[in-house]
């Protein structure tokens, strides 16, 4: 259901419903937001309606406004139960059904943002042809095992105002007589139909040219769908020039052979073993890397200590050499120091001789280029300000880009639709298998029951003939009748047990539905609204009493 909620939110934002970016699901809709969005949709469907745009603060006005919205939804064709409680004390399932119906009724030009005359590239044209082929395959396909309710559940528009005659979300009796799995299967089918109907309304998806006509009726989705060359080309394009996928029929035939299944199992086991070995090797590699880093750090510490010891050794060796003949060595050092001092004085005089003209030249250049330096300083300040402005603009654009990136692309919707179709096919196969097993079991039960009844009749007739003359036959007849009675009671108990289990499952389904209705939250909200109405009633009574008192005083005067 998250995908449907995303599509609903995207469609509401396309018609300028002013939804916050923090809204990520229908469960976050407050009554005020719900009233505003539903009113916007109804005004787009029928501009002649006079509907309020906001929810007033008073409880009496709230009941009036929500009741008017419920009547407007019924007037445009909504067939399910709807009233003020749908807006004030709603649950996600009811809100989703209402929005699905309203979005289906929206005029086409209110949600289609793509230019129908825009040129199509080669890939878009290929996708359009694929979607046309899928639509033709899905139209008019019926399966003998499909319930008649589902065969006749169509989505159509009547009249010139693009209103649904009986939309698929309003069929209240479609799931009558079916179990929990049938209802889930039907729910998945309706989700897929809703995906196909809403795909062309996405402004950034490019489905405007895909050919999903809203005025064309769509039959129940069923049966096998063949894979044509266009689908293979599209898959190859999205796989970035990878190897072409073989035909779906060859894959199914190859998958059904026992040898190929055995080979696949062996390959999967080998892959699992290789993955285990790879993970073990990676773990060992990480351990060795950690050990290598530890050893390298230790070696580096030892090398640094060795370097320090070498320096100390050199100093001590020189000191030892000097201490062997101290007077001569001290005289040599003093002569070296005196020579170094003389050399330093000579270099200082040479430096002063070169420094004076250089300083004069530097001062001359500074005086000459002071204006250029000041201009460069001002320009650098302007560049810094411009950089700050552009950095803020870049941050804002990055936020907008991230917000725009939440929109799901056309490829994601296409793959999701194909995935839902595959799930429907799989669920249909499971349901057909269950129905076949149930019918086979029922036939077997009926056959065995008939055989037992016939055998009892024959045995009863044979024993009853001899019961008058033979005492043992009489006792056998009594035991036979008792056995037949007890077996009948056991059969009745088994049937009652099945009935009780079925009722238990139905009650569990009802409990799940009640949990989805947010009964506790709605009761708390109703209690708050009741207290608010009581406070308003007391304020009105006090105002009436004050008016009566003022009127009585004026009368006495």
UniProtKB/Swiss-Prot annotation:
Belongs to the CCDC22 family. GO terms for molecular function: cullin family protein binding. Residues 260-350, 489-554 form a coiled coil. The keyword Coiled coil applies. The keyword rRNA-binding does not apply. This is Coiled-coil domain-containing protein 22 homolog. InterPro entries: CCDC22, CCDC22_CC, CCDC22_N. Keywords: Coiled coil. GO terms for biological process: positive regulation of ubiquitin-dependent protein catabolic process. PANTHER family: COILED-COIL DOMAIN-CONTAINING PROTEIN 22, JM1 PROTEIN. Disulfide bonds: none annotated. It comes from Anopheles gambiae.
């Amino acid at each position: 259901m998250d995908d449907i909620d995303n599509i609903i939110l995207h469609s509401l934002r396309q018609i300028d419903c002013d939804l916050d970016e923090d809204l990520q699901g229908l469960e976050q809709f407050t009554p005020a937001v719900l009233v505003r969005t539903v009113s916007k949709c109804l005004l787009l469907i029928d501009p002649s309606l006079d509907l309020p745009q906001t929810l007033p603060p008073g409880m009496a006005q709230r009941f009036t406004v929500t009741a008017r919205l419920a009547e407007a939804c019924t007037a445009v064709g909504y067939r399910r139960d709807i009233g003020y409680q749908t807006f004030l004390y709603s649950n996600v399932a009811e809100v989703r059904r209402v929005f699905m119906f309203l979005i289906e009724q929206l005029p086409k030009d209110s949600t289609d943002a793509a230019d129908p005359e825009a040129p199509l590239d080669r890939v878009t044209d290929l996708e359009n042809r694929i979607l046309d082929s899928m639509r033709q395959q899905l139209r008019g396909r019926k399966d003998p095992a499909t319930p008649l309710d589902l065969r006749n559940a169509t989505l159509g528009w009547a009249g010139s105002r693009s209103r649904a005659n009986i939309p698929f979300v309003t069929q209240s009796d479609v799931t009558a007589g079916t179990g929990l799995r049938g209802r889930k299967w039907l729910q998945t089918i309706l989700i897929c139909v809703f995906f196909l109907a809403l795909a062309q309304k996405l402004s950034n998806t490019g489905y405007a040219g895909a050919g999903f006509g809203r005025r064309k009726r769509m039959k129940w989705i069923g049966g096998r769908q063949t894979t044509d060359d266009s689908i293979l080309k599209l898959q190859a394009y999205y796989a970035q020039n990878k190897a072409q996928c073989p035909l779906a029929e060859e894959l199914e035939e190859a998958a059904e052979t026992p040898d190929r299944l055995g080979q696949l199992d062996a390959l999967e086991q080998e892959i699992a073993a290789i993955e285990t070995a790879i993970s073990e090797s990676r773990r060992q590699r990480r351990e060795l890397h950690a050990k290598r880093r530890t050893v390298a750090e230790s070696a580096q510490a030892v090398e640094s200590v060795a370097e320090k010891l070498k320096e100390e050794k050199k100093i001590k060796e020189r000191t030892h050499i000097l201490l062997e003949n101290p007077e001569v060595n001290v005289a040599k050092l003093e002569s070296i120091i005196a020579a170094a001092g003389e050399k330093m004085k000579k270099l200082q005089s040479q430096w002063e001789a070169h420094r004076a003209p250089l300083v004069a030249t530097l001062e001359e250049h500074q005086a000459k280029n002071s204006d250029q330096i000041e201009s460069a300083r001002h320009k650098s300040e302007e560049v810094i300000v411009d950089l700050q402005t552009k950095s803020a603009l870049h941050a804002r654009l990055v936020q907008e880009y991230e917000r725009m990136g939440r929109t799901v692309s056309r490829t994601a919707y296409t793959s999701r639709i194909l995935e839902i179709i595959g799930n429907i096919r799989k669920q249909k196969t499971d349901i057909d298998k269950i129905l076949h097993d149930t019918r086979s079991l029922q036939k077997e039960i009926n056959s065995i029951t008939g055989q037992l009844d016939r055998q009892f009749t024959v045995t009863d007739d044979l024993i009853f003939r001899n019961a008058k003359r033979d005492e043992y036959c009489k006792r056998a007849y009594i035991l036979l009748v008792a056995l037949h009675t007890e077996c009948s009671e056991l059969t009745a108990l088994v049937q009652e047990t099945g009935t009780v289990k079925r009722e238990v499952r139905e009650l569990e389904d009802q409990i799940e539905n009640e949990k989805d209705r947010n009964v506790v939250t709605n009761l708390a909200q109703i209690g708050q609204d009741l207290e608010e109405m009581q406070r308003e009633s007391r304020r009105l009574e006090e105002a009436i009493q004050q008016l009566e008192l003022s009127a009585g005083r004026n009368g006495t005067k």
